[in-house]
Amino acid sequence: MRHYEIILLIHPDQSEQVPAMLERYKGMIVAGGGQVHRVEDWGRRQLAYLINKLAKAHYLCLNIEADQAVMAELEHAFKFNDAVLRHLTVQKKKAETGASSMMKTVEREEARKASQAEFAASNER
């Protein structure tokens, strides 16, 4: 089996359906004998250019180990799901389980927003 990294751009109006989509895709991988090594929800982010007249999308990153039959099934599911705006699958040499640089950026942004909110709350007193 080979290792893959999959990036999904989901329609921003479908953000509530993301957990159900993830479970469905993870179920397809496990049912095919594969493994899910890492799942990251990067949240709603600005796009570099408009896709279907949308300026934002919900980003997901999956690191998996699967065979070609499972990958073909996943690619087919991505193509025929209207909520998936774009998908990118990259073959990797080994499984990556640590936090990606994008996830570290997301965590830094969340920490910065929390500290700003805390600072604003302390100044109101």
Swiss-Prot record:
Gene3D superfamilies reported for this sequence: 3.30.70.60
One Pfam family matching this protein: Ribosomal_S6
Region spans: Disordered: 94-125
Keyword set includes Ribosomal protein: yes
Stored CDD domains: bS6 (cd00473)
Family: Belongs to the bacterial ribosomal protein bS6 family.
Protein name listed in UniProt: Small ribosomal subunit protein bS6
Native species: Acidovorax ebreus (strain TPSY)
Lineage of producing organism: Bacteria, Pseudomonadati, Pseudomonadota, Betaproteobacteria, Burkholderiales
